[in-house]
A protein has these predicted regions:
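Histidine-acidic metal/acid-base catalytic patches
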Residues: 1-28, 53, 57, 84-89, ...
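A generic secondary-structure micro-motif detector
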Residues: 8, 41-42, 71, 110, ...
Length: 283
């Protein structure tokens, strides 16, 4: 296994500082957030690619992914991302999946998504880079089985999945081993974080980020299932627990939580890595 940090958990730092923090705490790679606020802008990613590559290489980090919010129908942006990824030597980038909208209905959204994804597949064929959809609540790929229904039409050498098991605690949860049995051929990156549910003052329930070891997701069972499924790629840490987030989430959800003070950067990066490494070695 290899270990990386999603730069979205380092909103306090610029790109150079983020790469140095990741290096300093012993990681193998970095997954760069490519969006408006930080760390690189999608519209400029082809021009920024040499700088992104230089920053990463100076820190001794492999760029394991570019995490974008580009839609499946934005073909010019996808071409730009593919060109940038080739310059950087990055094998994958994330595209934004389709949100579920009951007014449109699942079947219509599904058919449209599969059609667009097939066009993306044709666009990337032979380019040496893979487009990923993230298993994420609020989307039509909120579980491994639903994700397979979409990506299963495509070549796993070109189209893949970011498996985010903590997201399925919020929506889409299923047995860890069964989920990986379904989607394992397409899993190309794994996001690491944890989630808890808490009752609000109004008596309703909402989710919050939590410590890796304390949340509702059983990471020991998840790592065991990943190993048994043959996964040996990157664990990329997207642990936003007590991080001073400066943006809304993937589906525009409020991911801020000021109930506890932010954790210092080095202790959280080193602590998360130590926890996961020990777990991987022990399972």
């Amino acid at each position: 296994m290899k270990y990386s940090v999603f730069s979205g958990v380092l909103p306090e730092l610029d790109a150079e500082q983020a790469a140095e923090a990741v290096r300093r705490n012993g990681y193998d790679g970095i997954e760069w957030r490519v969006n408006g606020e930080y760390h690189f802008r999608e519209a400029e990613i082809d021009r920024a690619a040499p700088r992104l590559k230089a920053i990463s290489e100076a820190a001794g980090l492999e760029v394991c992914g570019l995490t974008t919010y580009v839609r499946l129908d934005q073909e010019d942006s996808i071409k730009r991302l593919a060109d940038a990824a080739n310059i950087i030597g990055c094998p994958r980038f994330r595209l934004f999946s389709a949100l579920y909208d009951p007014a449109k209905g699942y079947r219509a959204i599904y058919d449209d998504t599969v059609e667009k994804l097939k066009r993306v597949e044709a666009l990337l064929k032979g380019r040496g880079v893979k487009a990923l959809l993230e298993i994420h609540f609020g989307t039509i790929v909120c579980s491994p089985s639903l994700a397979y229904d979409v990506v299963g039409h495509c070549d796993p050498a070109v189209i893949g999945v970011i498996h985010d098991p903590a997201n399925t605690i919020i929506e889409g949860g299923m047995n860890a081993r069964m989920g990986l049995d379904i989607i394992k051929d397409y899993v190309d990156l794994v996001h690491v974080k944890n989630i808890r549910w808490e009752r609000t003052a109004e008596g309703t329930w909402r989710w919050r980020f939590d410590e890796l070891a304390d949340g509702a997701l059983d990471w020991r069972e998840t790592v065991s299932a990943l190993k048994d499924a043959g996964y040996d790629g990157y664990f990329s840490f997207e642990n936003l627990y007590r991080v001073p987030v400066q943006h809304r989430g993937y589906v525009a959800e409020d991911i801020s939580d000021t109930s506890l003070p932010p954790r210092d950067i080095d202790p959280r990066l080193s602590g998360d890595l130590a926890y996961m490494r020990a777990l991987v070695e022990d399972v």
